[in-house]
């Protein structure tokens, strides 16, 4: 069986990507199932036992910026080795709620960690590995903030300012501009039904 594909969902907190992730994966599984392929749904930080432990630390404990980035990439290496690469090798497709673009956007754009440091970690952990497709849920920070305020207690990142998320969004859009062959941008300021119509277009193009 041919190697599987790796799809990532990205966007600032409150963009709505997690809301649509399972719906997208269910539709994708309907298409792939007859060929004997499966859709593996995962997330970052997380995806493995170690990754989920790191997630609790990263989302809830203050720490040095470089420590934060190193922990992100440590969890990513484990995620690649134990979940993503084995699934792709057996022909399954993997859909992840966040991947390396999030680290460039949050730790780089949002927190100001120099890009060259993140690029060095990316090369070490991933080599040349990149997602086949990244779906970027784009929304103005003010709309995302209102959505975040309507749900559960926020974690460390969700509690950041609109200015932080404006920088994070700008970095996401910069990365999308640099890799247009990989990114599809979804206008997630739209109602849920309209966002799903956009995602149907993404599915149709796969």
UniProtKB/Swiss-Prot annotation:
Pfam families: Thymidylate_kin (PF02223). Keywords: ATP-binding, Kinase, Nucleotide biosynthesis, Nucleotide-binding, Transferase. It comes from the Bacteria. Transmembrane segments: none annotated. GO terms for biological process: dTDP biosynthetic process; dTTP biosynthetic process; dUDP biosynthetic process. ATP binds at residues 11-18. The keyword Membrane does not apply. Its EC number is 2.7.4.9. Belongs to the thymidylate kinase family. It comes from Burkholderia thailandensis (strain ATCC 700388 / DSM 13276 / CCUG 48851 / CIP 106301 / E264). It catalyses: dTMP + ATP = dTDP + ADP. The keyword Transcription regulation does not apply. The lineage of its organism: Bacteria, Pseudomonadati, Pseudomonadota, Betaproteobacteria, Burkholderiales. The gene is tmk. This is Thymidylate kinase. Phosphorylation of dTMP to form dTDP in both de novo and salvage pathways of dTTP synthesis. GO terms for cellular component: cytosol. GO terms for molecular function: ATP binding; dTMP kinase activity.
